[in-house]
From Swiss-Prot:
It comes from the Eukaryota. SUPFAM superfamilies: NTF2-like. Contributes to the ability of the fungus to cause disease on pea plants. Coiled coil: none annotated. Pfam families: SnoaL_4. This is Pea pathogenicity protein 2. It comes from Fusarium vanettenii (strain ATCC MYA-4622 / CBS 123669 / FGSC 9596 / NRRL 45880 / 77-13-4). InterPro entries: NTF2-like_dom_sf, SnoaL-like. Residues 1-20 are annotated as: Disordered. Signal peptide: none annotated. The gene is PEP2. Residues 1-12 have a biased composition (Polar residues). Belongs to the PEP2 family.
Length: 233
């Protein structure tokens, strides 16, 4: 049985600095936090030029609704979705960064809540998904930028705007979605008419699912990145 309280043995990048360390690396970690928090701050406010500054050329992002796309295509899809009524916001809850001793590669994990507003059949409600962003950063010519951004989707829920009005949920259909983002996936497909990825990284407790496998893979990928390997984005 999977150990629910521990990460995969050996997945910790032992040579990386995670806190304390030299003041110079603490400053770099502060820069990386600013970049990571830029995703929700810039995207939610439609500050697209600022949003672009997070990435290096050739970077990719993965989300439930977009799949794997180049960051420029993600921006274009976000704009198109907003014009069709998609209303997605984020709340940040803290971050941590592992950085290599040379100060050239880092992985920043940002705890956040994705909150998406839906209106179905006269019922207005939010779906909130607790997640962690995972940014793979690299410093080139003195500037940090993301090469890859993925998420762990850990748990979600529905919140009615008016408790007297709540939409009907098809319980059988709901069971087909991943445990970490089942309501988000259900309503993105039902209300937005899109196909959601069902194999996004989840939580350690999602035993017997591909989402647990992807959870662990993301940690191993971070270790390889911090140890200088080339990774497929």
């Amino acid at each position: 049985m999977v150990n629910l309280h521990s990460l995969p043995q050996g997945s910790r990048p032992n040579a990386a600095i995670r806190n304390n360390g030299p003041d110079s690396l603490a400053l770099e970690r502060l820069k990386l936090r600013e970049l990571a928090e830029g995703w929700p701050s810039y995207r939610d406010s439609c500050e697209w030029e600022n949003f672009e500054s997070i990435f290096h050329p050739g970077a990719y992002v993965y989300t439930t609704w977009s799949g794997r796309v180049a960051y420029q295509d993600f921006i274009a899809a976000s704009k198109a979705g907003m014009d069709k009524g998609a209303f997605i916001m984020h709340r940040c809850h803290g971050s941590s960064t592992d950085i290599n001793v040379d100060g050239t590669r880092a992985v920043t994990k940002l705890k956040a809540t994705i909150t998406q507003r839906f209106e179905v059949g006269g019922s207005e409600f939010d779906v909130e998904a607790d997640c962690r962003f995972c940014f793979y950063f690299e410093k080139i010519n003195g500037s940090w930028g993301a090469r890859l951004v993925k998420h762990w989707y850990e748990k979600d829920k529905m919140i009615p705007v008016n408790p007297a009005k709540f939409p009907q949920v098809d319980e059988d259909k709901l069971k087909a979605y991943p445990p970490g983002y089942k309501y988000l996936a259900y309503w993105q497909e039902t209300a937005m008419g899109i196909k959601v990825l069902l194999d996004m990284p989840g939580h350690r407790r999602h035993v017997g699912t591909v989402n647990l496998e992807k959870h662990d893979e993301l940690y191993w990928l971070a270790k390889r990145w911090l140890e200088g390997e080339q990774i497929e984005v």
